[in-house]
Curated annotation (Swiss-Prot):
This is Porin Omp2a. The lineage of its organism: Bacteria, Pseudomonadati, Pseudomonadota, Alphaproteobacteria, Hyphomicrobiales. One of its GO terms (molecular function) is porin activity. One of its GO terms (biological process) is monoatomic ion transport. Consists of 16-stranded beta-barrel sheets, with large surface-exposed loops, that form a transmembrane pore at the center of each barrel. The pore is partially ocluded by a peptide loop that folds into the pore lumen. It is found in: Cell outer membrane. It comes from Brucella ovis.
Length: 346
């Protein structure tokens, strides 16, 4: 009701103003020139200039749908049916040139829907209460997954930890973190130096993140700290990072190497060590002191890519996953994947 009153009041004021000037000569304003949207190709495909500015904008996104069956590779429990999930991600990139370098922003919104198998608790369907039961669930959520600003080599905002991003993520598979290599999303202030000879270095002050069961954000003013070095060439790359968890006052490190055997076949290997032999920390979230991951990618055709990853940690957990990412048509990829987990002590 308040909004409607404001709109009516504004309309009345405009009519009164027009009536007061009725005796004046009416001069029609010159029509403004039409400004068409211009393509901006300086930062890649899909960018256009925001009208009236020299800032380039790209709007993109994806839709993903997962169907999972068999045992839960993270816990070992039997799903007793299908678990399904859907995600819509909406992404915005902006870039413009300044006297201090390229000023950029990146934002990603995620809309998630998850439906787990109900496993019949006796309240739905013709089953008795003595069945091996576990209630299913349906959940929805919206996350601001990324929101950061870049200027030159600086990055400020919500991103994923440099403990992951600087060395590179794990394999191109869905269940890549059965043996976790650290928490992901965090607030951070980071600077990356990039040399002209393939050498780069990073230093980051991070807030820490949280998962379903644990909160790894900092306690007080002292941030978590990450530093790393990398060398990359046509043959591949080698990178290492060291991270300090300011809450438990322990550190963790990772070293990773990638080798391009051919233009279609590549392999990678990563080893990690933590001074605290517990996964309840921000960085060294594998079991025990150490963990190792490795994988391979083979581009079989223009449409089909094979991916393989294996991992093992100090507590005896082993995880192996393989998939085939098949591009049915441009923009639509189907990825069948199979995973195996052997838990420590089995």
């Amino acid at each position: 009701m308040n909004i409607k009153s404001l709109l009516l009041g504004s309309a009345a004021a405009l009519v009164a103003a027009s009536g007061a000037q009725a005796a004046d000569a009416i001069v029609a304003p010159e029509p403004e020139a039409v400004e068409y949207v211009r393509v901006c190709d300086a930062y890649g495909a899909g960018y256009f200039y925001i009208p009236g500015t020299e800032t380039c904008l790209r709007i993109s996104g994806y839709v993903r749908y997962d169907v999972k069956g068999g045992d839960d590779v993270y816990t070992g429990s039997d799903r007793k049916g299908w678990d399904k999930g859907a995600r819509f991600a909406l992404m915005f990139n902006t870039n413009s040139e300044t006297e201090l370098g390229t000023l950029g922003t990146y934002t990603q919104l995620r809309f998630n829907y998850t439906s787990n198998n109900s496993r019949h608790d006796g309240q739905y369907g013709d089953f008795s209460d003595d069945r091996d039961v576990a209630d299913g669930s349906v959940s929805t959520g919206t996350d601001l997954q990324f929101a950061y600003i870049t200027l030159g080599g600086f990055k400020v905002g919500i991103d994923e930890s440099e403990f992951h991003t600087f060395t590179g993520y794990l394999g191109d598979i869905i269940n890549d973190d059965v043996i976790s290599a650290g928490s992901y999303r965090t607030g951070k202030i980071a600077y990356t130096f990039t040399g002209g000879n393939g050498f780069s270095a990073v230093i980051a002050l991070e807030q820490g993140g949280e998962d379903v069961d644990n909160d790894y954000t900092i306690d007080g003013y002292m941030p978590h700290v990450v530093g790393g070095l990398k060398y990359a060439g046509g043959w591949g790359s080698i990178a290492g990072v060291v991270a300090y968890d300011s809450v438990i006052e322990e550190w963790a490190t990772k070293v990773r190497g990638d080798v391009n055997i051919t233009d279609r076949f590549s392999v990678w290997l990563q080893g990690a060590y933590s001074s605290a032999a517990t996964p309840n920390q921000n960085y060294g979230q594998w079991g025990g002191d150490w963990a190792v991951w490795g994988g391979a990618k083979f581009i079989a055709t223009e449409k089909a890519t094979f991916n393989l990853q294996a991992a093992h940690d100090d507590w005896g957990k082993t995880a192996v996953t393989a998939n085939v990412a098949y591009q049915l048509v441009p923009g639509f990829t189907i990825t069948p994947e199979v995973s195996y987990t052997k838990f420590g002590g089995e």
